[in-house]
């Protein structure tokens, strides 16, 4: 059976080959007939396009688009904790962001209509009002734990998917087991978009960490900001105003004040049975609610 030939845009192909700075002579050795694909005298199969993408180290999907997208500019628009400079971003993180941007570009073309909640709020809004709205959109009660039981991550993922948000989990670059994602570098990121918003979660994190990141990035969508999330729990928890606002909402959704005050004990082991978050988040919540003092914290 003959493989299906693809009508690849030659300008797109040439753009990414030149941008990769891979010498043409080397590419010709790695990919047979690459010159014929560039001048249009031959059409490549999907596997052959994949070979080119691998040779120039970009996602295959970029070569299948009808126009180029400048992923580097989009990547540099991200904010990180403490406004960290992104020049030192690992190739694993950079390639993962590119992969998600390609997926988003494709999905955007398949979807009609806009999502009205993306960018609906700002940090000047009352955080409790934002919490109420997010709960309404997710269709979850304040005491969601009764419904989620011990599967809170799956519970929220399904609720978020239902809103038209695409959620991806991975602990490596695509299927490459040699290119693992570093939890010390990032826990997740969000690509805000009115049609095809994407949340990516670093699967190397704990389940409770993944859940906190998932809700954290969801809140960023309601504010309409792209972000790479990286909070190491031993840090001093200092954020810019946007991060402080987002984390306040995230904590209230996952550990509602009314539910926490119902607990008769502040023993962390007991509280962990009721709330699917880390002990650090619980202690921080107790401090913010003035249930414990700064000294105890």
Task: Describe each model-derived feature in a short phrase.
Residues 1-297:
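Short juxta-domain linker segments that transition from a proline/glycine-rich
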């Amino acid at each position: 059976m003959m493989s299906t030939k693809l009508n690849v845009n030659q300008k797109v192909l040439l753009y990414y080959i030149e941008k990769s700075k891979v010498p043409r002579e080397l590419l010709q050795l790695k990919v047979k007939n690459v010159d014929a694909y560039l001048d249009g005298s031959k059409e490549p199969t999907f596997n052959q396009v994949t070979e080119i993408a691998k040779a120039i180290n970009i996602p295959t999907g970029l070569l299948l688009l009808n126009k180029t997208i400048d992923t580097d500019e989009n990547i540099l628009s991200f904010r990180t904790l403490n406004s960290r400079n992104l020049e030192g971003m690992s190739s694993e993180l950079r390639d993962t962001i590119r992969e998600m941007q390609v997926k988003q570009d494709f999905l955007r073309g398949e979807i009609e209509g806009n999502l009205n909640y993306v960018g609906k709020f700002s940090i000047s809004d009352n955080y409790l009002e934002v919490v109420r709205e997010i709960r309404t959109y997710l269709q979850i009660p304040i005491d969601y734990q009764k419904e989620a039981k011990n599967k809170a991550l799956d519970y929220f993922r399904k609720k978020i998917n239902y809103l038209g948000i695409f959620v991806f989990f991975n602990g490596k670059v695509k299927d490459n087991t040699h290119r693992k994602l570093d939890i010390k570098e990032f826990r997740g990121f969000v690509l805000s978009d009115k049609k095809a918003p994407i949340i990516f979660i670093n699967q190397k994190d704990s389940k409770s960490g993944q859940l906190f990141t998932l809700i954290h990035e969801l809140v960023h969508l309601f504010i309409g900001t792209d972000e790479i999330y990286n909070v190491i729990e031993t840090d001093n928890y200092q954020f810019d105003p946007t991060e402080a606002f987002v984390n306040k909402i995230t904590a209230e959704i996952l550990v509602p004040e009314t539910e926490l005050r119902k607990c008769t004990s502040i023993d962390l082991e007991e509280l962990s049975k009721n709330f699917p978050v880390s002990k650090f988040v619980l202690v921080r919540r107790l401090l913010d609610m003035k249930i414990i003092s700064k000294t105890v914290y």
